[in-house]
Amino acid sequence: MKNTIDQKAREGYALELGKLIDDSFATFKKTFLVSGLGMLIVSAIMVLFYIGLMGSFFGFSNLSKTVLSIETLAKEPNFIIGSGIVSMFVSALFAPFTAGFIHLNHLAQTQKSFSIDNLFDFYKEPYYKQIFLSYLIIGGITALFTTMLSLFGYEKINTFVQIIFSLATIFTIPLIIYGKLDYTEALSKSVQLYAKQPLIILVAMLIAVIGMLLGIFILCIGIIFTVPYLYAMHYALYAQAIGFEKTAPENQEL
């Protein structure tokens, strides 16, 4: 598999936008209910985590006062730097959930059984360490750039920087869990692979965002159940760009 990845990173690969849309929607239809319920659970965990984090720094006695304290400190250099560091570790801590959401699509595509339990599969070794370290680096670099921009008064560019880093590292998790690369190789190859088809990848993810929003307004279902379409497109991109070996991880083998 490593030879295939090296070849694609070196010579390039083909992506068909129409097929990406068809494939992503096909797996989304199979996984949206489980993924949506999983998103509820993960969102609840993150909310509790952030409440605990804010409470440990600002106290639990008055939540509204805590929010006001954060708003007051938001432009303080020390707070900006501190929040960047916290964001870096939080993104790394929750990254295995991203792997779980992506993997649900693989299980559906390969006609394997899946459940909410599969969202926690990549908190196990050998995957957890590699995913955690990769997103610690991604989060660290992103936090460095966004913190510097904020300190110099260019907060409006932060979103653009975050989008660029997200797209350039889009293949990192699939390369770890399916390509069996370590975190340094996965990061490097992801950037190389993205550079071969940047426009189509950007358009595909933009379509995924639009599809997510249309699902909210047209189908009248909550964003919790439409966000997983982003992971379906994420999976479709890797599946079409790289593909899989028969030994790719299944829920029974983890």
Where does each model-flagged region fall?
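Membrane-interface interhelical connector segments
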Residues: 72, 109-122
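Selective recognition of hydrophobic, aromatic-rich stretches within alpha-helical transmembrane segments
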Residues: 2-4, 77-112, 143-182, 216-247
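Short, small/hydrophobic-residue-rich motifs at membrane-helix boundaries and re-entrant hairpins
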Residues: 7-22, 26, 30-110, 139
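Outer-membrane beta-barrel domain signature
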Residues: 39, 45-58, 63-64, 146-154, ...
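Cytosolic juxtamembrane C-terminal amphipathic helix followed by a basic/polar low-complexity tail immediately after
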Residues: 4-6, 12, 16, 244-254
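Interfacial aromatic "cap" segments that immediately flank transmembrane helices
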Residues: 14-45, 116-144, 165-216, 254
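A general structural signal for short secondary-structure boundary/capping elements
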Residues: 56-57, 238-239, 252-253
